[in-house]
Regions:
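Acidic, glycine-rich flexible loop segments
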Residues: 1, 5-7, 76-112
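Residues embedded in well-ordered regular secondary structure
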Residues: 1-36, 73-75, 113-118, 133-136, ...
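Short acidic/polar alpha-helix capping motifs at helix-coil junctions
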Residues: 9-11, 93-98, 116, 236-240
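Gly/Ser/Thr-rich beta-alpha loop segments that engage phosphate groups in nucleotides
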Residues: 16, 95, 341-344
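Generic detection of intrinsically disordered/low-complexity segments and helix-coil linkers/edges
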Residues: 21, 82, 86-89, 95, ...
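Extracellular/periplasmic, surface-exposed regions of secreted and cell-surface proteins
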Residues: 41, 47-56, 61-66, 76, ...
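Intrinsically disordered, compositionally biased low-complexity regions
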Residues: 167-168
Length: 380
């Protein structure tokens, strides 16, 4: 469809030699090129910086949003569906199932677009911001402390209706997709990120500006946690769950069909860092850095602390006298660097401590007793 999009923003800003502020509110709405995939968002942004004295400055920033995400469907299946299959059967007034060689993997995308339209209600909330203080002292020193936080809360409910399609390969030419039962599911997810940074910087020039030095030392902490709960229930015998958002709650379904799941983890890092940047006459460049990181994700291995460093150098040749007459070349720099890196952001929250998952069971004894089997979900 031809979609309607609107973006609306209003803001207030002001500044003086010692104070600046900003406040903005926005609203966005997208109808979506695919029917029933509308999206809307309300945002608020605020910031304030205040220069208390010539050497002391404080401020904050806040961003908030409420989003109603699109009721997304598997429309990309249209790219994979065979082009010879009819989309709709006029005689039966039903959408068609795809041919036998495809229908086990792919549904007719129009079934999702039309028959499963508006079957998801979700709300996403997010708030993030920071406060900071910055002080200059002893002419060449600067110290900045910042505390940041990011909080997200997402929840949603989904309804699965009974969907019938035209399928000439079954008796009566009408097939029911899935289990043939209405179903509701719910989820709720919260994630928190907290970070603090403390950075001391020394900047100075010597010998009439020929030697320029910037040295930085810092200490940072980071905390991240996530908690998610999922649940679903199907209808009871003869008790169809109505297609009414006010009734899309798992408490309405048959308790005997309940399924649930959860995900939760938390971890933190602590880092100490130092960096030196030096140049001579702006042409000969050097930098070196060192950091020591500790991560709770590896605490069970006794190897949670690691050291990382980097060294780099450069030569800005275009600033040399013998390059001044080359007009067609604006800048020429030769540089090289070497360093070590680490990564804790793997697809597992605890890469060093794998969880157990179900495996093949075994039967022993008379009478027979089933012994459930377990295995490591992944190798550490």
């Amino acid at each position: 469809q031809t979609a309607f999009i609107t973006n609306n923003n209003i803001s207030i800003t002001g500044a003086s030699p010692k104070h600046s502020f900003y406040l903005g509110v926005g609203y966005s709405y997208e109808q979506g090129n695919i029917e029933h995939e509308k999206f809307s968002k309300v945002t608020i942004n605020a910031s304030n910086d205040y220069k208390i004295t010539d050497y002391l400055k404080v401020g904050f920033q806040f961003n908030g949003a409420r989003m109603l995400p699109a009721d997304s469907k598997q429309v990309l299946n249209a790219l994979r569906a065979t082009p010879i299959a009819p989309v709709y059967n006029d005689e039966y007034g039903l959408y068609s199932a795809l041919p036998e060689f495809q229908k086990a993997q792919i549904n007719n995308p129009m079934v999702d677009v039309s028959l499963r339209a508006n079957t998801t209600k979700a709300e996403n909330y997010r708030a993030s911001g920071n406060i900071y203080g910055e002080v200059d002292f002893l002419k060449h020193f600067n110290f900045k402390a910042m505390f940041s936080m990011d909080y997200a809360s997402n929840n949603g409910r989904t309804y699965q209706p009974i969907v019938k399609v035209y399928d000439p390969t079954v008796s009566g030419n009408i097939a029911t997709l899935g289990t043939g039962k209405t179903e509701v599911s719910q989820f709720k997810e919260n994630e928190t990120k907290v970070q603090s940074d403390y950075v001391l910087t020394y900047t100075n020039s010597f010998d009439n500006g020929n030697h320029n030095l910037t040295a930085t030392a810092g200490f940072t902490t980071y905390y991240n946690s996530l908690s998610r709960l999922d649940g679903a229930r199907k209808q009871g015998v003869g008790l169809v769950i109505p297609n009414d958002p006010d009734k899309w709650f798992v408490s309405i379904g048959d308790a005997a069909t309940a399924t649930n799941g959860s995900t939760q983890w938390e971890r933190s890092t602590l880092s100490m860092l130092a960096r030196v940047i030096y140049n001579y006459k702006g042409k000969y460049l050097f930098n070196g850095s060192f950091r020591r990181d500790g991560s709770s994700a590896f605490s069970y291995t006794g190897n949670e602390w690691q050291n990382f460093f980097s060294l780099g150098g450069g030569w800005l040749m275009s600033e040399e006298e013998f390059m001044k007459d080359i007009k067609w070349l604006d800048m020429l720099k030769i540089k090289a660097s070497y360093g070590t890196l680490g990564n804790q952001n793997l697809d597992k929250a605890y890469p060093a401590e794998p969880l157990l998952s179900n495996a093949y069971s075994a039967v022993f004894g008379k009478p027979s007793i089933i012994y459930p089997g377990y295995q490591l979900a992944y190798l550490p």
